[in-house]
């Protein structure tokens, strides 16, 4: 299976799950045969403000590659700028979160709330894809 220029060993993909897909869990899933591991979502604004906890969430172990980093936010300019800022990190794919229904995310117009604004979705995806060379995917939620 291929996603852009990234070839996966198989089509078993670990979904990004906040509070679950930390490094030990990802390594366990890799040992069990996952072809792509997805990290917990990170906030574009937290990257912008150099949040130390967010830096820790973006740590990648060589044994887990390939890995996808999931970014969330609702400002297309900040999303694209932060995607570019972190592009040198060793993740293979950037995933945009448009599926998280948690009130503190969706309540800010981020995550699944973006599905209510197709024009903003288009702008975010377009700007992020243009900003980086790595493949970009989008996690969505069916309905809202």
Show the residue positions of the predicted features:
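Flavin-dependent oxidoreductase catalytic cores
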Residues: 1-144
